[in-house]
Amino acid sequence: VFPVAEHHDGFQMYESELSHWNAKEMGPKRDLLGELKSAAESCGLQFCTSSHRAEHWFFMGHGREFDSDVREPMKKGDFYWPAMPEPDPQDLFSKPFPSEEFLDDWLARTVELIVKYRPKLLYFDWWIQHEAFHPYLKKLAAFYYNCGKSWGEDVMICYKHDAMMFGSGIVEVERGGFAEAKPYAWQTDTAVARNSWCYTDSLDYKSSREILCTLVDVVSKNGNLLLNIGPKADGTIPEGDRQILSDMASWMKVNGEAVRGAKVWRKSMEGPTRAVDGQFADAAEIMYTPEDYRFTVNGGCIYAICMRCPKDGRFLIRSFAESANQNLPEFHGILRVVTLLGYAGQAAWHVDREGLHIAVPGFESDFPVVFRLEVD
């Protein structure tokens, strides 16, 4: 569970000794982050959190451009402070540089989060790659990782845009991913809606099938999916979000072994359709075909996941074709058992030079179809 502790606006969703602008002293008068942590851990879930405080340097800046209450004098502790001009997001050296006062406050707030809530993962949004943050981010990472060691916990920072040295955290790709599997840990954060991270009355929901396909594609490439839902102001989860989560839970109950704790196989996929490299690539659904498969391994089994169920119930997985040349980097193992997860009957299958043929007449599914392959 990964609630936002503080977003760009600078209002803390937790009890803080560093600012009065927080949910414990104002609004609901509750430590929402602390309550979510307790609820998550009581259900056996890991608690993580995110900070977007870095972007507060400029988030209120446009308020200076018209008649508003964003005006001088402003000082540390004011809600709008410092309201600087919005920089070019691609400029790592944009001016004015964040001040020492702001950076010290950023560091103190993040340390407070770590000490009070002990998150397993700590996510930062994009602006920490600015040159001014680098010495502070190094101090923060050292502090957090040393805390994790003292707690006996494996903790990690999620970062974007090479804000940290490669290998010192988890590479984050917002609303996107990679075309090929990566040899390092990475994560994509995306939402159930295409047009918003939070609840609105005009959400453009993705389908449950699309989100499950994203999950499968990401895991097959050594990634993790961080899926955002947006509660209403009263804390209730919108029906559209609930339906997606319910569909995912039903699918995971049957097919979870193919993704939960699964690793990358020698190849991540076959078929004509693939994701593209980079961020903000989910504006339109990727239209997978019955020829598209993703592969994972778990517990000594290979999992072949068909991204769209063929209407005739006949599957062909070319990556498991018989090979006459043992020198080629192809599959040369012996298939012993082929199981369609969630199917009560026995799938008929055979292997030839074309591939692994599986026949399940009459089988239909709107979601990815998972085959467990037991091999020698």
Indicate where each model-derived feature is located.
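Mature catalytic domains of secreted/periplasmic carbohydrate-active enzymes
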Residues: 1-376
